């Protein structure tokens, strides 16, 4: 995805909707703004759009998005952006939203880390899990010099592991996915999990055990990493110990720690909104307790919430739709099918051309 056509905001230029967060939910919200004929801006703290998919898992394959039997994370982000960019949303990158203020006239001011303030008629928070930092193994100390070289917390580039002896730690979806995903390119893969059973998707867990039974993958359950050997700032081996006290050492070039992330919603926690499970409580329209202020995706909490990409896209659709009542008060809200709207726009483009 190229970003060279994005432009910076004029501080007081009013948009209909400010979208906080440029992950899949935020990008799709921008598309929905275009479909509903309202202007928007996305404010994203990272240097690129895509959220965790772009920052942590660009080469991870996703299987549970409707219409995509299988799609790499970066490919999904590109497709979502291609869908949204036709409506020319304004994009603000490398800016963290710090606070908001609702004016007496109902307008929202959103202030960012650089000191700029952006104004809109409504706000949609699509900040995912907020700021996230990888969980580390406390028994591995002073490893900063190895991080990004021999020790990783995500797979951003498969080439980093090609031809290497890889030890993966974890039992969730990411650990299982990459245990299978790296088999074709790595010299060897060893999966170490401290529990007796995996917590990831059952289908992938079955694939992991099949690979183990076929002798393609080494799986160590009820086992923890206890230490590492390093020479000249390069990883050489990983030491593990099982619950029965048995110790083993594996030659290793790469240690991939996939044991989750700590999330922090940061300044949003100080906005006076109701928070449950580190997420903002919303109603059935994705509205918070403040009129005109919405939340969608992983940052939104409601009974029965499922934190997957698919529900985030649905949340965004409902939030944008309901925001029209606040952005265009008194106007009758009409639904236009996407096929009809796109046909009209194509016809208009041909006439203007």
Swiss-Prot record:
Entry EC no(s): 1.18.1.2
Cofactor descriptive note: Binds 1 FAD per subunit.
Residues that, per the record, bind FAD: 25, 44, 52, 57, 97, 132, 298, 339
Domain of life: Bacteria
SUPFAM superfamilies: FAD/NAD(P)-binding domain (SSF51905)
An example molecular function term from Gene Ontology annotations: NADP binding
Cofactors named for this entry: FAD
Family (UniProt): Belongs to the ferredoxin--NADP reductase type 2 family.
HAMAP family linked to this entry: FENR2
Protein name: Ferredoxin--NADP reductase
Upper classification of the organism: Bacteria, Pseudomonadati, Chlorobiota, Chlorobiia, Chlorobiales
